[in-house]
Regions:
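NAD(P)H-binding glycine-rich loop region in Rossmannoid oxidoreductase-like domains
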Residues: 85-124
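C-terminal substrate-binding subdomain of Rossmann-fold SDR/epimerase-dehydratase oxidoreductases
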Residues: 230-234, 238-350
């Protein structure tokens, strides 16, 4: 499968990132969970490219449940696919005898599943993370990076939010399984750092998209719906008034942050990862896309569906992520809102 030019450019820019300590990965075995997903795939892609360009003698083990996607990944990248779900992952099922770095990106991210299958969402987050951490301890991993979410902050916060700030979460809410699962997984990660001396870090990502995110019609996240409207020349339809603030991050920027955390992050700590300058309301984001990406050829309209609650949308928030902590490690986001959409759409058109 041909790699879009814009995605190839993203990978090259990451390889030339001076803040990443590439030599730390030399002769290492790297386990990437959820490697058939967007973020896991992005990490695996960059590591495989670095292996060639920097002669790192890396071994990349890509874990996932979907065997078809896994075999496709093996055909495209120089990885070894580990066909197993994280809830079944163990030293025996992994077949591994070494893992120097672990990037734990696996998890249920479908909003509809959060509402319809909350037990699976919660157990995948908690039990899956415990299994990954146990495996990391058994294999003597030097670093584990857990991909968490800004949703751990819950409700009731406003203004600039740092990693030490936390809002409230209703455990009985219709989609609380996702943020509760992320909170519990983060707690496990920090606990393993304390008990076993395992070097763990938690990356609280904003809404992540960009080149490398496939145009999968099953993915109904807001950025993909907006981008599809641009391609189709249709008005952008908002299912709410769009007053909630969203914190976003370009996919390649997120991958760079995760690679930095693997070698520079402080053990047992969390880091916000987002382009704080691109934070805006959903309505404002839609207007940017209509005006700057579609060139003013489409409009933004509000059409609230009757089954709104069943769609599992996150409650509206009004906070913006503070990113000074990750920036102190040498990270800077490269792309603003319009460019993020333009690059994702360009990758779809390639």
């Amino acid at each position: 499968m041909a790699v879009p030019d814009v995605l190839r450019d993203d990978v090259e820019r990451t390889l030339n990132e001076p803040a990443i300590l590439w030599d730390r990965f030399r002769s290492a075995t790297v386990l990437v969970t959820g490697a058939t997903g967007v973020i896991g795939n992005g990490i695996a892609r960059v590591l495989c490219a670095a292996n060639v360009s920097k002669d790192l003698d890396l071994t990349v083990v890509a874990q996932g449940r979907d065997i078809v996607k896994g075999r496709r990944l093996e055909a495209e990248l120089d990885v070894r696919f580990l066909a197993a779900g994280v809830r079944e992952l163990s030293l025996a099922t992994s077949g591994l005898d070494k893992a120097d770095f672990v990037f734990h990106t696996a998890g249920v991210t479908s909003s509809a599943c959060m509402v319809a299958q909350p037990q699976e969402v919660l157990e995948t987050a908690v039990d899956g993370t415990r299994n990954v951490l146990d495996l990391a301890v058994a294999l003597g991993a030097s670093s584990v990076v857990y991909v968490s979410s800004m949703e751990v902050y819950g409700q009731g916060l406003a203004g600039l939010v740092a990693e030490s700030d936390l809002g409230s979460l209703d455990p009985d809410g219709p989609r609380s399984s996702y943020p509760e699962g992320k909170r519990r997984a983060e707690a496990l990660s920090a606990a393993y750092a304390t008990k076993y001396g395992l070097h763990t870090t938690n990356a609280r990502l904003g809404l992540t998209f960009g080149a490398g995110v496939p145009n999968d019609l099953d993915n109904t996240r807001v950025p993909l719906q907006f981008a599809r409207s641009v391609l189709a020349g249709h008005d952008i339809e908002l299912h709410t008034d769009g007053a909630g603030v969203t914190n976003v991050c370009y996919l390649a920027d997120a991958v760079r942050a995760l690679l930095l955390l693997a070698t520079k992050g402080a053990a047992g700590e969390a880091y916000n990862v987002a382009n704080s300058q691109a934070s805006m309301t959903i309505r404002q984001m839609a207007e940017v896309v209509a005006r700057e990406v579609a060139g003013g050829t489409i409009n933004v309209v509000v059409k609230k569906p009757e089954d709104l609650e069943s769609r599992g949308y996150a409650p509206p928030s009004s906070y913006r992520l503070a990113t000074g902590k990750i920036r102190a490690l040498g990270w800077e986001p490269r792309y603003g809102m319009a460019e993020m959409y333009q690059r994702m759409i360009a990758s779809w058109r390639s």
